[in-house]
Amino acid sequence: MKMQTVAVLGSTGSIGQSTLEIVKKTKKFKVVLIFANTSYFKIISQIKIFKPKIVIINNLKVYQKIKKFKKFKKLIILNNITNIEKYLKKVDITISAVPGIA
């Protein structure tokens, strides 16, 4: 059975982290996109563990710090959610755990 692809919006919050724990335990899903705001160390950890293809960081300072990592050169790292729809269209499941986003 093919793994389903998942996008987690709000990956560093409590619901996002719970979602990622389930993903890690089930082995039925592949996280391909994470969206987070300011939790620098959590974002770094999630990138290392889940190896998403796309990381969107809302906070400009955190985005700039993570963008400098040479290890993450193959990642698509964005600071703008304006065109997020084009990435979400390619994902099987989207978990929206961001307050104010439906």
Label for each model-derived stretch:
Residues 2-53:
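N-terminal Rossmann-like dinucleotide-binding module
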Residues 26-28, 70-73:
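Short helix-capping segments at alpha-helix termini
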Residues 35-37, 58, 97:
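Conserved residues at the C-terminal ends of beta-strands
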Residues 40-43, 60-66:
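Short, charged/polar "capping" segments at the starts of alpha-helices
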Residues 51-54, 73-75, 88-93:
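Short acidic/histidine-rich motifs immediately flanking catalytic phosphotransfer sites
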Residues 56-58, 74-83:
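Short acidic-hydrophobic, aromatic-tinged amphipathic segments that line or gate anion-handling sites
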Residues 79-102:
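Beta-loop-alpha module in the N-terminal Rossmann-like domain of NAD(P)-dependent dehydrogenases
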